[in-house]
Structure formats: structure tokens, C-alpha cells
């Protein structure tokens, strides 16, 4: 990956991944569209918190882990977003990245993602799915971020809200 692109992946920034056509992704898109998100934003079905340069925390089955973005997601279309807050750039983003890293090596909340798509599934509150983990990490520093919603109610498209997030870069890895 080119150095100029890697420079966009600062610690604590959020990386949104466009749908690749999987069964769960289609369910997430439908849920986000039903929640009122535009099609342009609803197609982002996965999110990770950047650890800086080519690293991020990937919360996906079977366990969350630190990955190398350029290897794990090569060829995927992404948007890099940052939280709109002066303190965020002055250092708070490092704490968000730290809180996200705390979630590494935890199991993935399969029941949580199923409850996200099908309301009759019960969620495990000790485990996380991708947008829930990103929201939790952000709200550890900014409790009112994402309009104060509970992390388990958060969807990847919530990180596209132009009032709370600013796009840093968009394109294919």
C-alpha cells in the first residue's frame, strides 16, 4: 500500500468497509436502510478502529484481533473517518485506539449480530460485534458521542453522520 494512503490511518480513526455481498452484510444493509440511512451510507457493513499505519482492531468471528489492513482487506473499498472534536486530534484519539485494543482476543458476539438482524435473538453483553466495539471505545472518552446511544444499538452507518464525523479518505485499498 502506498505511504500516502497509510498516512490516513491514524490511531483512533474509524475505517468503514463497503459490503462485499455476504449474507450477513445484506441483512445489515437492509437494517441500516430501514433505520433511515441513505443507500450510499448503508453499504458500509463493517467498521474497525485504526491502530495507526497499517494496523487496526478487527472485531469479527471467531475472536477480535489486531490485523494488518493492507493484507486482510486488500482490494476493499473503504472510508476513513474521524470524530469531529478538537480534543480528538489533540490526543483523545489515542485513548480511543487504546480502548479498542482492549477488546482484542475477546470472542465475537455472534448472538449480538444475529440480534442486530433478528430481534428475537438475545445478545451477550460481555462480547462485541464491530460497530458495538467501535462505539464503546469512542464513548469511553466521549459518552455523548453517537448521540449517546447504547453501543449495542450502533450500526456501521452511524459513523457516517457528517455532524459527528469527518471523512479523511475514501477509496480502494
Where are these regions (language model features)?
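Glycine-rich catalytic cores of cysteine/serine-nucleophile enzymes that process amide/ester linkages
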Residues: 14-87, 113-122
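Loop/turn positions that initiate beta-strands
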Residues: 9-13
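Hydrophobic/aromatic-lined pockets within catalytic cores
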Residues: 20, 52, 104, 138-146
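Activation targets extended, charge/polar-rich intrinsically disordered C-terminal tails
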Residues: 113-173
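A structural motif
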Residues: 70, 77, 89-113
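Short, surface-exposed secondary-structure edge patches
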Residues: 1-8, 39-41
Amino acid at each position: 500500500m502506498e505511504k500516502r494512503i497509510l498516512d490516513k490511518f491514524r490511531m483512533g480513526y474509524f475505517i468503514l468497509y463497503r459490503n462485499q455481498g455476504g449474507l450477513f452484510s445484506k441483512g445489515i444493509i437492509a437494517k441500516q436502510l430501514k433505520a433511515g440511512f441513505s443507500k450510499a451510507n448503508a453499504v458500509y457493513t463493517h467498521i474497525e478502529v485504526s491502530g495507526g499505519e497499517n494496523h487496526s482492531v478487527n472485531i469479527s468471528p471467531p475472536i477480535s484481533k489486531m490485523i494488518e489492513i493492507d493484507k486482510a482487506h486488500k482490494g476493499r473499498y473503504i472510508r476513513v473517518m474521524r470524530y469531529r472534536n478538537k480534543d480528538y486530534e489533540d490526543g483523545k484519539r489515542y485513548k480511543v485506539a487504546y480502548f479498542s485494543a482492549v477488546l482484542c482476543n475477546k470472542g465475537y458476539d455472534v448472538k449480538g449480530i444475529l440480534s442486530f438482524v433478528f430481534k428475537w435473538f438475545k445478545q451477550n453483553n460481555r462480547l462485541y460485534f464491530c460497530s458495538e466495539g467501535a462505539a464503546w471505545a469512542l464513548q469511553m472518552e466521549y459518552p455523548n458521542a453517537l448521540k449517546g446511544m447504547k453501543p449495542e444499538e450502533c450500526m456501521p452507518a452511524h459513523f457516517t453522520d457528517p455532524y459527528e464525523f469527518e471523512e479523511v479518505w475514501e477509496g480502494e485499498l
